[in-house]
């Protein structure tokens, strides 16, 4: 179980969503990607009309991600967001998921 406070949780997830949104803003002219962030939920739509949806699950202190392939639940562990089922680290996962759906590699983290 996460040791985050609700305040820490919201700050961490808001930072992730902002970082993704800023990167999408940089590349939106090069790739046919639309996105919208509203109330802790970020929808990303690709040229093929598929989507990735990221949203807060505050009661569980998790970040949930839905792709056209599956749903993923990330919990904060040892300074990283880790998927409960597959053990993937969030930034590695989201870069692969976007590449699969956009057809182009996108680097979100440093």
For the regions a language model picked out, list residue spans one by one.
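N-terminal intrinsically disordered, cationic/polar leader segments
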Residues: 2-110
């Amino acid at each position: 179980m996460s040791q985050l406070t609700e305040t820490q949780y919201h700050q961490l997830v808001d930072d992730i969503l902002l970082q993704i949104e800023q990167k999408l803003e940089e590349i939106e002219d090069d790739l046919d990607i639309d996105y919208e962030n509203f109330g802790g939920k970020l929808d990303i739509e690709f040229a093929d009309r598929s989507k990735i949806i990221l949203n807060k699950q505050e009661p569980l202190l998790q970040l949930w991600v839905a792709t056209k392939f599956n749903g993923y639940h990330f919990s904060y562990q040892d300074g990283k967001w880790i998927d409960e089922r597959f053990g993937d680290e969030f930034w590695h996962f989201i870069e692969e998921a976007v590449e699969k759906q956009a057809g182009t590699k996108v680097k979100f983290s440093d």
